[in-house]
């Protein structure tokens, strides 16, 4: 099985988009990319906007090769909407290229969903239904694609139990010799998700960590995330790719240090330098103004 991480916070944008090739089936997972419109009270720096365009081009390139597209939930960093969005680098043309003629395995648009995502799901389906090859609501279901199985979890909370951000579905890809789980915005904060991952016993887990950058609003999430991921590591011995929300926090290397097995970011998996641009937005704006700043990565 071939796994290609496409876009994420360690690559400079908000995303967990991944391309997987298994048994001749090409699968694009969560094909969205976005920037946080405000961080430290600041809009995205110029280099963030440039990186967003670069990641968009990469996602479109892999979309052209994909047979199957999966969507874990309807936030714009996990699917590409059909409107022109500056901070999503989205357009109808991009969306059509991703979804037209594809098998879409997607989070249920009406069950276990909050109001905001229900509206987004309705808009998505209105545009995707006429152009997709087939659309299946994937929650809790398994699909056999000629020797490759895609098994989806039941809907689990986006973060901790009772999260107002709604629900997501995880996906297990099994080609008979290797098992990979993509667990997008579980944030390692709810038991249902942790237990499902342990039960499925993957060889590789791709997941997003807790949103510790939110400070008081995410109180206790650091400790819970460490505890839950260490449990997954002990029970499965899976290789871990950890990225997304946790990498919006400058302290993410310390989080990685507390784990019993050190994960890789998307950048680390690709053997390139981590560039957590959003976490360093304040410094990037100063740099744009010609001020001298220290950054833990190269720019330009």
UniProtKB/Swiss-Prot annotation:
Pfam family, one: Lactamase_B_2
SUPFAM superfamilies: Metallo-hydrolase/oxidoreductase (SSF56281)
Entries under PANTHER family matching the protein: UPF0173 METAL-DEPENDENT HYDROLASE MJ1163-RELATED, UPF0282 PROTEIN MJ1629
Family: Belongs to the UPF0282 family.
Protein name from the UniProt record: UPF0282 protein TGAM_0379
Lineage: Archaea, Methanobacteriati, Methanobacteriota, Thermococci, Thermococcales
């Amino acid at each position: 099985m071939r796994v290609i991480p496409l876009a994420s916070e360690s690559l400079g944008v908000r995303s967990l988009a991944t391309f997987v090739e298994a048994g001749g089936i090409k699968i694009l997972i969560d094909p969205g990319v976005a920037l946080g419109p405000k961080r430290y009270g600041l809009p995205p720096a110029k280099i963030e906007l440039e990186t967003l365009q670069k990641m968009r081009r990469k996602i479109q390139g892999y979309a052209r090769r994909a047979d199957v597209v999966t969507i874990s939930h309807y936030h714009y960093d996990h699917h590409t909407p059909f409107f022109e969005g500056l901070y999503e680098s989205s357009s109808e043309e991009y969306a059509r290229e991703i979804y037209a003629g594809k098998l879409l395995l997607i989070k249920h648009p009406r069950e276990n969903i909050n109001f905001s995502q229900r509206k987004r799901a309705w808009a998505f389906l209105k545009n995707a239904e006429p152009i997709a090859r087939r659309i299946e609501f994937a929650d809790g279901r398994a699909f056999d694609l000629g020797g490759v199985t895609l098994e989806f979890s039941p809907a689990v909370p986006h973060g901790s139990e009772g999260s107002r951000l709604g629900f997501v579905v995880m996906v297990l890809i099994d080609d008979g010799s290797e098992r990979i789980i993509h667990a997008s915005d579980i944030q390692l904060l709810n038991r249902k998700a942790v237990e499902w991952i342990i039960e499925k016993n993957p060889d590789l887990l791709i997941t997003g960590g807790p949103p510790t950058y939110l400070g008081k609003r995410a109180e206790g999430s650091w400790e819970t995330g460490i505890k839950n991921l260490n449990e997954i590591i002990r029970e499965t011995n899976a290789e871990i790719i950890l990225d997304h929300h946790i990498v919006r926090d400058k302290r993410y290397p310390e989080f990685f240090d507390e784990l019993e097995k050190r994960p890789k970011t998307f950048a680390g998996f690709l053997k390139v330098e981590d560039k957590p641009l959003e976490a360093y937005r304040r410094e990037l704006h100063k740099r744009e103004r010609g001020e001298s700043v220290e950054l833990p990565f190269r720019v330009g």
